[in-house]
Amino acid sequence: MTHKRTKRQPAIAAGLNAPRRNRVGRQHGWPADVPSAEQRRAQRQRDLEAIRRAYAEMVATSHEIDDDTAELALLSMHLDDEQRRLEAGMKLGWHPYHFPDEPDSKQ
């Protein structure tokens, strides 16, 4: 007697409609351009250094910048970061889901 239910759980987690050998986390499920851990670490280091440089520059010139401009600059930095995160996710096959404006509109 096979335990059908427990055997199906990993398949459910990976997405049932994927073919068996091609489920998400398995053999050929990922695109080839997923960065390795070293590449991710290096990219993160570069990002952190860029952020530190930008922050040091902002602190150096902060006495001549009024509050509204500083807030706008910070907001734009956050938006850039979010945009980069979205683009990195879309390379992996993730797509941002847009909620419809009206609740009863058809997607």
Swiss-Prot record:
It comes from the Bacteria. Keywords: Toxin-antitoxin system. Residues 1-42 are annotated as: Disordered. One of its GO terms (biological process) is negative regulation of growth. Toxic component of a type II toxin-antitoxin (TA) system. Upon expression in M.smegmatis inhibits colony formation. Its toxic effect is neutralized by coexpression with cognate antitoxin Rv2654c. This is Toxin Rv2653c.
